[in-house]
Amino acid sequence: MGQKVHPHGIRLGIVKPWSSTWFANTQDFADNLEGDFKVRKFLNKELASASVSRITIERPAKSIRVTIHTARPGIVIGKKGEDVEKLRNAVSKIAGVPAQINIAEVKKPELDAKLVADSIASQLERRVMFRRAMKRAVQSAMRLGAKGIKVEVSGRLGGAEIARSEWYREGRVPLHTLRADIDYNTAEAHTTYGVIGVKVWIFKGEILGGMAAVAQSEQQPADKPKKAPRGKGRK
């Protein structure tokens, strides 16, 4: 049987950045890696209802900087920033160094594979028909500008005795094209019949110029207002 490589892993350093960006000596590397794992595990558990897409970690000069990408920043920040302060103290305690937490808003959650997968999983747990949940996610993504999307669910679908897989695709999802910007993620729906796995691939377009183009797009301010062209006036 043909197997699929992880779309993010094969594109690291080509069009996908690392989720942890730091350098360490040989003796510190394992401790830093374990610290990153514990921080991510803690934040994903604490912010399970906050629609967290991804968590990036930097370690400048004996400190840790955590950026939480979320579709619901208000829940993460809390009233007058109380919740984010609690998170900062907890992360600092886990990592053993001073912590800084930044919040980045995900503008279009319908185009984020993690959030789409979580949404489908939560619908399956609420006994929504799996075909309806898949079709709704695909239509929303295509309406908001995705070039293509594929959704796959597997398990005891609809309470069937025998587990099976079903998938739905719209547009194109070129997994072999390394310059293709493909967002991929998974989720699990824990139902009364058992666990149902959800996989989502979203193709957002091709990135020309590699990591330099990715870095430039991240530095540019989002939704910069465009100036209206001036009229030529009367001749």
Curated annotation (Swiss-Prot):
It comes from the Bacteria. The keyword Nucleus does not apply. InterPro entries: KH_dom (IPR004087), KH_dom-like_a/b (IPR015946), KH_dom_type_2 (IPR004044), KH_sf_prok-type (IPR009019), Ribosomal_S3_C_sf (IPR036419), Ribosomal_uS3_bac-typ (IPR005704), Ribosomal_uS3_C (IPR001351), Ribosomal_uS3_CS (IPR018280). Coiled coil: none annotated. PROSITE patterns: KH_TYPE_2, RIBOSOMAL_S3. Residues 215-235 are annotated as: Disordered. This is Small ribosomal subunit protein uS3. The lineage of its organism: Bacteria, Pseudomonadati, Pseudomonadota, Gammaproteobacteria, Pasteurellales.
